[in-house]
């Protein structure tokens, strides 16, 4: 047993995923509220006087009320050390969300009770399934009129292909929402209105057999609840921890993050059901988190978190052992020993220096420009590399025009920094130079973020000219193919990425297929490692 086992077993590192506006950021805030990390939960709604969400810190986020970066939030609760990877809630930022999911051991899926499973939920769910991590479901906004509860469960099972096991059950919805019935204790948790959820909610626990239960709900609601419980006991899957751990069964909870209904109950159950840090695959095999030897990988790079200092932070997920700020480590890709500078942990925009951290924790270190996403850091005696983080094909492309050529140096620095963070991808025409830059993004809002950040952080103005391309492909067998001799369609464009890899841009799927037909030895792929 590792001498760090006790500390590592306390860790719970998870991401919260959802479709935009399902209430993910509000739920995150309430976790922090119950954990004592904040004293007053602020509404994420966009009035000028409203408090900004704790996990939204970039200026453009505060102005628009969306999360466009991934925040890392740590707090303690009931003996656990919790690391929340708060992923971007806006649908345009799924690639950054994907990388963040690579650092999580489990995921909380937030679903709007009035809308059910939505587009981004499906996409992010597939990523979790691919990683075989446990998935927990919180059906939110039950204080509003919601879809039929059984229909919601059926939709999750059919749309996402995962079995469901409700741990609690809502009593009504909308104006008739009275709380939740806990299937484990056979009791009802009733919640009071807590100043629109800005304070920890107080609740009363009452047995379903208690005559006073009719003070909480009317006889019709009680009869309906009893009928639903009977149906649920006969039809739903039984809780199976092994199936949950494999990502084959999702425990389901109901509540309202805005008013605190069901939030603490969910948090307590979740922490017991979810996993401590999981082993990670590397080129040497699985790396045990309980190992005494330190190891970590970079899953995110964020430049200019402090505008005044133009700093750059590399976020690392610790995979095994203990991090000690005084220790020397080995940067595998850089092939050199080093000390990690200014190690810190984050609470949105605030940060504090850390001397030690354990497997499951996320730390940010000062990056002088040597780290890339996916890099491995380990103890000097262990020179292995964790599996790389894939780069996925962007869906939108534009040519970048610099409006003031005298600011070329700032422009090149800025756009390269933003690209290294993974918010955008940069391409150049084959045999071109930095004078002609094509930017690819997963969602069109990232174009706005690019313009905003270049102007506000680097004092550079650009114009973006949209390009008609909708598909991009890496060449998997580039060593065996002469790129110059690829016979494509007239609208195909040959480009390279920042690593010098050749790629092909296509206007439509037909062009992709035609190029593959004309070049039978060519192997194209939608992502690059």
Question: Locations of the language-model features?
Answer:
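Structural and coupling elements of P-loop NTPases
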Residues: 1-529
């Amino acid at each position: 047993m590792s001498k760090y086992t006790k500390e590592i077993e306390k860790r719970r590192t998870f991401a919260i995923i959802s479709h935009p506006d399902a209430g993910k950021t509000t739920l995150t805030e309430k976790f922090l509220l119950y954990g004592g990390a904040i004293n007053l939960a602020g509404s994420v709604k966009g009035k000028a006087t409203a408090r900004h969400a704790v996990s939204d810190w970039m200026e453009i986020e505060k102005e628009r009320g969306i999360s466009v970066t991934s925040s890392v939030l740590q707090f303690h609760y009931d003996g656990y050390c919790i690391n929340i990877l708060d992923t971007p809630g806006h649908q345009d930022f799924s690639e950054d969300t994907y990388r963040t999911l690579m650092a999580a051991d489990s995921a909380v899926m937030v679903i709007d009770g009035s809308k059910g499973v939505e587009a981004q939920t499906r996409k992010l769910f597939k990523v979790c399934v691919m990683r075989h991590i446990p998935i927990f479901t919180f059906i939110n906004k039950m204080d509003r009129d919601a879809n039929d509860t059984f229909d919601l469960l059926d939709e999750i099972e059919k749309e996402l292909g995962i079995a469901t096991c409700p741990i609690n059950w809502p009593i009504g919805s909308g104006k008739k929402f009275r709380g939740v019935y806990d299937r484990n204790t056979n009791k009802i948790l009733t919640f009071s209105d807590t100043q629109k959820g800005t304070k920890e909610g107080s609740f009363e626990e009452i047995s379903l057999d208690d005559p006073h239960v009719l003070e909480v709900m009317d006889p019709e609601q009680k009869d309906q609840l009893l009928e639903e419980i009977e149906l649920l006991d006969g039809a739903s899957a039984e809780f199976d921890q092994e199936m949950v751990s494999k990502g084959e069964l999702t425990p389901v909870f109901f509540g309202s993050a805005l008013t605190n209904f069901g939030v603490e109950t969910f948090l307590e159950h979740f922490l017991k059901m979810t996993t401590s840090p999981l082993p990670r695959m590397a080129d040497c095999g699985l790396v045990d988190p309980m190992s005494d030897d330190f190891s970590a990988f970079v899953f995110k790079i964020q430049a200019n978190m402090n505008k005044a200092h133009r700093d750059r932070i590399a976020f690392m997920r610790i995979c095994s052992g203990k991090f000690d700020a005084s220790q020397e480590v080995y940067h595998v890709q850089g092939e050199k020993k080093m000390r990690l500078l200014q190690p810190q942990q984050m609470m949105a925009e605030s940060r504090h220096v850390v001397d030690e951290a354990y497997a499951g924790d996320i730390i940010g270190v000062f990056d002088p420009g040597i780290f890339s996403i996916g890099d491995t850091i380990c103890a000097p005696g262990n020179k292995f590399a964790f599996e790389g983080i894939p780069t996925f094909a962007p869906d939108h492309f534009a040519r970048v025009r610099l409006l003031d050529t005298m600011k070329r140096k700032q422009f090149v620095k800025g756009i390269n920094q933003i690209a290294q963070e993974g918010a955008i991808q940069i391409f150049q025409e084959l045999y071109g130079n930095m004078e002609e830059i094509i930017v690819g993004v997963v969602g069109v809002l990232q174009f706005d973020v690019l313009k905003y950040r270049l102007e506000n952080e680097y004092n550079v103005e650009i114009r973006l000219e949209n390009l008609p391309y909708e598909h991009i492909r890496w060449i998997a067998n580039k060593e065996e193919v002469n790129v110059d001799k690829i016979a494509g369609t007239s609208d195909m464009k040959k480009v390279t990425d920042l690593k010098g890899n050749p790629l092909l841009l296509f206007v439509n799927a037909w062009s992709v297929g035609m190029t593959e037909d004309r070049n039978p030895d060519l192997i194209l792929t939608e992502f690059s490692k």
